[in-house]
Amino acid sequence: MYGIEYTTILIFLISIILLNYILKSVTRIMDYIIYRFLLITVALFALTRAQNYGLNLPITGSMDAVYTNSTQEEVFLTSTLCLYYPTEASTQINDGDWKDSLSQMFLTKGWPTGSVYFKEYSSIVDFSVDPQLYCDYNLVLMKYDQSLELDMSELADLILNEWLCNPMDVTLYYYQQSGESNKWISMGSSCTVKVCPLNTQTLGIGCQTTNVDSFEMIAENEKLAIVDVVDGINHKINLTTTTCTIRNCKKLGPRENVAVIQVGGSNVLDITADPTTNPQTERMMRVNWKKWWQVFYTIVDYINQIVQVMSKRSRSLNSAAFYYRV
């Protein structure tokens, strides 16, 4: 009798253990199936909703050839070329159809109609305040003017290089430059920048920190000023904050999708003498023609050779992007 009871109890315990094992196995299998299903669902959702950042943006994200986007139906754009020229050019040409004529000429060089954009600017100083370099390849035509030689040089330094910049609060803090690649760049309708170098006791060196008139003036009524001071020394800065902003910038390297073409002048502007220009090459050329039609004809003729020394980038440059990351 006792043997039968013990057997019954043993069978009951074995059944409970077996049932528990089966339930755990089923739970593990269900967890595996559910997690796999969720993983596949998330992956498919991310793939179908993916955005190829920079590929669907006009002009800035174009590609060399036409490809089909793997996640969307739109096709990529073709390479784009922006030609920036002064108002003087269109005034001298005085032809309402001159852009269409040039577009047809660019077509003979392999640039499809609609891939070349003509951008007019009023003056070098105005263009330097808000450069808009949105195309895959950007050619900036600058008419040489001896009185604006320094402005042209600073603009070339700005647009031919990439800069990493951060805002500066000159009312609260002192600032110093850490090396040759570190510059302060001020931009605005009228920038007057004064500095007072400080010693280790934060006393002015040759100036009084409480007297702005004793500060050293390094830019006056400029629209663009790239400021270089002695490295490793704190400076108190004064500038016209109502009409100007200033940023603490580091030169990262060449912006290879931009070239500057100087029109006229006895010498080509040279920014490679700056020790921060590395490598010591530049995409600056000169054409010596008196008439703008001749200038544009020359550019059409040599456009493919010019582009060969450039590299297309998807990043664009405007004043806002320049301030934070170019």
From Swiss-Prot:
Keywords, ordered alphabetically: Calcium, Capsid protein, Disulfide bond, Glycoprotein, Host endoplasmic reticulum, Host-virus interaction, Metal-binding, Outer capsid protein, Signal, T=13 icosahedral capsid protein, Virion
Q: Which InterPro entries match?
A: VP7 (IPR001963), VP7_1 (IPR042207), VP7_2 (IPR042210)
Q: Where is Ca(2+) 2 bound in this sequence?
A: Q177, D228, V229, D231, D301
Task: Indicate yes or no for the key word Calcium.
Answer: yes
Positions of region (CNP motif): 165-167
Q: Does the keyword Glycoprotein apply?
A: yes
Q: Which domain of life is it from?
A: Viruses
Q: Which GO terms describe its molecular function?
A: metal ion binding
Tell me where in or outside the cell this protein is found: Virion; Host endoplasmic reticulum lumen
Please list the residues that bind Ca(2+) 1: D95, G206, S214, E216
Q: What is its main location?
A: virion
* GPR motif as annotated region, ranges: 253-255
Report the PTM annotation: N-glycosylated. The N-terminus is blocked possibly by pyroglutamic acid.
Q: Where is the signal peptide?
A: 1-50
Q: What are the cysteine partners in each disulfide bond?
A: C82-C135, C165-C249, C191-C244, C196-C207
Question: Glycosylation positions?
Answer: N69, N238
Q: What does this protein do?
A: Calcium-binding protein that interacts with rotavirus cell receptors once the initial attachment by VP4 has been achieved. Rotavirus attachment and entry into the host cell probably involves multiple sequential contacts between the outer capsid proteins VP4 and VP7, and the cell receptors. Following entry into the host cell, low intracellular or intravesicular Ca(2+) concentration probably causes the calcium-stabilized VP7 trimers to dissociate from the virion. This step is probably necessary for the membrane-disrupting entry step and the release of VP4, which is locked onto the virion by VP7.
The miscellaneous annotation reads: Some rotavirus strains are neuraminidase-sensitive and require sialic acid to attach to the cell surface. Some rotavirus strains are integrin-dependent. Some rotavirus strains depend on ganglioside for their entry into the host cell. Hsp70 also seems to be involved in the entry of some strains.
Family under the similarity heading: Belongs to the rotavirus VP7 family.
Assembly and interaction partners: Homotrimer; disulfide-linked. 2 Ca(2+) ions bound at each subunit interface in the trimer hold the trimer together. Interacts with the intermediate capsid protein VP6. Interacts with the outer capsid protein VP5*.
- Please identify the protein, giving its name as recorded: Outer capsid glycoprotein VP7
Q: Give the species this sequence originates from.
A: Rotavirus A (strain RVA/Human/United States/D/1974/G1P1A[8])
